[in-house]
Amino acid sequence: MADHRLVAVILEVSDLDSSVALYRDAFGLDLHPGNNAVDDRWTGGSHAEISWTEGAYLHFSLYPAKEQPTSGVQISLSVDNIESAHAAAVSACARVLHEPRNELWGRSGRYADFDGNVIELTQHT
């Protein structure tokens, strides 16, 4: 059987600059500007991106929405300290869906971006 792996998450957002600032300040993702000079509805044009190459490769991008922004997606980020991560999210004006609480896998808080996507911050125990 083929080894299929998730390698990219791409969200279309209503305001790229504001979203880049939120993901940086609230969630610690240092997105870098990118510009793919291709005529492709999904991957062409200006955007912001970050890739993790240690362990399994994963790429995350924000693109300006060409029609409706992506919504209803949940991504989860592992953090070392949920309380300080929560404080950073609140300080950056992320909308708190629920404050850090005990879950089966550790402590998690959930937040929404400007387009309604959910960002879970989790400290695994």
Model-derived features with residue positions:
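Short beta-strand micro-motifs in enzyme catalytic cores
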Residues: 46-48, 73, 105-109
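Short amphipathic alpha-helices within nucleic acid-binding modules
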Residues: 22, 83-88
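Vicinal oxygen chelate
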Residues: 2, 8, 86-125
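Acetyl-CoA-dependent GNAT
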Residues: 33, 56, 60-65, 98, ...
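Core segments of cupin and vicinal oxygen chelate
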Residues: 3, 10-57
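Eukaryotic phosphotyrosine signaling hubs
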Residues: 6-8, 72-74
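Short hydrophobic/aromatic beta-strand micro-patches
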Residues: 10-12, 76-80
